[in-house]
């Protein structure tokens, strides 16, 4: 699909926006993608995703759909299934890979048995947090099926959530019924883009304050991107190999971005894959375009 976009003049529908927690990021991604496609000669129709999107696509009959959606329903297999039923070609991963990768626990169940190192942990009900910690502190709470670090919190002994977490505590996880609780891994935040079957590079993400949350990802100046990351050669190679192996094992296509934590004190054994993103951001601050340059 990437080669087709590069070598042919097409009518491309860019799906963006929608109603997920990542709507604004998707609109920014979509606008940038549409502008880039027009620069290389394609005819582009921008579509802000709504529940009439199938009718709109049938009206314009594009040659291909560029999926610039993030979160539900554009990243979880729903839109992919619709496009399959309509017989429309589209970018990025298909229904099955998208449905698996959006579910962090299901992804772990598939990749960990293949020897891809991932953190332990388990799914908990958010209401149960008030009865006691699901893991020894520090630990990470994250929604099972959200991206862009939406709803992520690090719970430490020094956190202001209380011990156990108080019912009055205001945490970013509160809008979600189910959460994935994982041990906190000290060290570096890394990411690897895979594009058309090739791992591109390893970037270290260095937040200027706090951790690499939603604001740090999408606010200029809050995160330093070091590409290539300053790592031992064997860690760089391992991260790229793990990202490509995960991409292939899940059946992904086009572009993905795999996120890691790396604890230098543990050496190579301290490298953990956190998740695979099948709809990576394409904003001016996003990592896949940066690594692809």
What annotation goes with each model-predicted range?
Residues 1-96, 100-102, 106-109, 113, ...:
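ATP-binding N-terminal substructure of ATP-dependent carboxylate-amine bond-forming enzymes
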Residues 124, 152-158, 194-196, 263, ...:
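Short beta-strand-to-turn element immediately C-terminal to the catalytic PLP-Schiff-base lysine
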Residues 183, 247-282, 292:
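Conserved metal-phosphate-binding beta-hairpin within the catalytic cores
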Residues 79-84, 211-219, 278:
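Short, flexible, mixed-charge acidic loops at enzyme active sites
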Residues 160-241, 267-272:
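Phosphate-binding site of ATP-dependent enzymes
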Residues 2-16, 44, 100-188:
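Active-site nucleotide/adenylate-binding loops and adjacent lid/helix of ATP-dependent enzymes
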Residues 71, 149, 208, 277-290:
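Glycine-rich phosphate/pyrophosphate-binding beta-alpha loops
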């Amino acid at each position: 699909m990437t080669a087709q976009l590069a070598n042919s003049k097409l009518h491309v529908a860019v799906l963006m926006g929608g109603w997920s927690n990542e709507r604004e990021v998707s609109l920014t991604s979509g606008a940038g993608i549409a502008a880039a496609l027009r620069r290389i000669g394609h005819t582009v129709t921008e579509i802000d995703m709504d529940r009439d999107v199938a009718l709109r696509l049938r009206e314009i009959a594009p040659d291909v759909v560029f999926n610039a959606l993030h979160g539900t329903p554009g990243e979880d297999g729903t839109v992919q299934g619709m496009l399959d039923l309509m017989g429309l070609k589209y970018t990025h991963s298909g229904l099955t890979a998208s449905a698996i990768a959006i579910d962090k626990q299901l992804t772990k169940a598939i990749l960990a048995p293949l020897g891809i190192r991932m953190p332990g942990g388990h799914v908990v009900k958010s209401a149960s947090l008030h009865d006691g910690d699901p893991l020894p502190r520090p630990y990470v709470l994250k929604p099972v099926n959200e991206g862009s670090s939406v709803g992520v919190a690090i719970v430490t002994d020094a956190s202001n959530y209380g011990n156990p977490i108080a019912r009055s505590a205001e945490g970013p996880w509160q809008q979600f019924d189910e959460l994935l609780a994982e041990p906190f891994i000290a060290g570096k935040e890394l990411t690897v883009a895979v594009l058309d079957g090739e791992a591109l590079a390893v970037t270290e993400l260095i937040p200027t304050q706090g951790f690499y949350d939603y604001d740090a990802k999408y606010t200029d100046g809050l995160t330093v991107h070091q590409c290539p990351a300053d790592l031992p050669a064997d860690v760089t190679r391992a991260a790229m190999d793990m990202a490509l192996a995960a991409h292939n094992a899940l059946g992904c296509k086009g572009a993905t971005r795999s996120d890691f934590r790396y604890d230098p004190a543990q050496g190579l054994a301290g490298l953990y894959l956190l998740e695979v993103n099948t709809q990576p951001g394409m904003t001016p601050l996003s990592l896949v375009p940066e690594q692809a340059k």
